[in-house]
A protein has these predicted regions:
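Long, charge-patterned amphipathic interaction tracts in eukaryotic proteins
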Residues: 3-38, 69-172
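Non-transmembrane amphipathic alpha-helical segments
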Residues: 40-57, 91, 98, 102
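Charged, low-complexity interaction regions
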Residues: 59-63
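A long, low-hydrophobicity, low-complexity, charged/polar interaction segment common
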Residues: 116-250
Length: 250
């Protein structure tokens, strides 16, 4: 997490805390998800800046509460549109490209490690087993690191071993996870990072709204119960301002 804990901003957007939720995030995968970390860092920094701007504008004697709110909202929108949202969109898109590409790698065909005759005998043996026994035998070969048996089955059309395409796809993924663990780890990391970016966009937008704030309308019994009857948002203020400016249009 950031050295300085800022309670004004949700911990869900802290870059270190966010990356810490990715199980496979370490030195091996950090470079592949760096775009996500950068996006979170910029969001966190920008939200702190919005809170700071709100505190500073409150000291401006030339602006009333409505003017202060609009000034903060203008600053927030410029910052988010110019810096934060583009970073999040780019991070999500780039991570998704890797997910798509590596998902294909995880189910690509393999080359048989055995001779044609041995491969044929292995496939014939597997085809003679019952479906459950067949899947179990191939999975066991993969877990045992027996590339000869596994590749003999998966390096040929599925029907030759008594499999269908769906079964073969499942086994191919299992094969690549066993024999290419680095790729499997990277895929898990970028998938988690993409889902994190996409899933926390709603948190980001809520935090922007919270940082900018609204004008609270005091209820008739505010002095007694401390209750507000409503609020005025920056959008509502802008609409009223623009409407009042129409008579001055040239």
């Amino acid at each position: 997490m950031s050295d300085e804990i800022d309670v004004r901003v949700s911990l869900d957007l802290d870059p270190e805390a966010a990356m810490g939720t990715i199980r496979d995030y370490d030195d091996d995968t950090a470079s592949y998800v760096s775009g996500a970390k950068t996006a979170f860092a910029e969001a966190f920094t920008s939200l702190r800046a919005i809170h700071d701007a709100k505190a500073a504008v409150a000291e401006d004697p030339t602006l009333n509460e409505a003017g202060q709110l609009l000034k903060v909202d203008d600053f927030a929108q410029r910052r988010m549109i110019a810096k934060v949202y583009p970073l999040w969109d780019t991070a999500s898109a780039n991570l998704n490209k890797n997910v798509v590409a590596w998902e294909k790698e995880m189910t690509k065909e393999v080359v048989s490690k055995a001779s044609q005759m041995v491969s044929g005998e292995i496939r014939a043996h597997m085809k003679g087993l019952k479906t459950g026994e067949r899947m179990a035998a191939i999975s066991q070969a993969i877990r045992d690191g027996d590339e000869v048996v596994a590749s003999a089955v998966l390096g040929a059309p599925a029907m030759l071993s008594g499999l269908d395409d769906e079964m073969k796809g499942i086994l191919l993924r299992e094969y690549h996870e066993r024999f290419n663990p680095g790729l499997a780890k990277r895929l898990r990391a970028v998938t988690a990072a993409r889902d994190l970016i996409d899933g926390r966009m709603s948190v980001l937008k809520k935090e922007v709204t919270k940082a900018v704030g609204t004008i609270k309308i005091k209820g008739s019994s505010f002095e007694i119960h401390g209750q507000y009857s409503g609020e005025i948002t920056p959008r509502q203020l802008r609409e009223k301002r623009d409407k009042s400016n129409k008579p001055f249009a040239v």
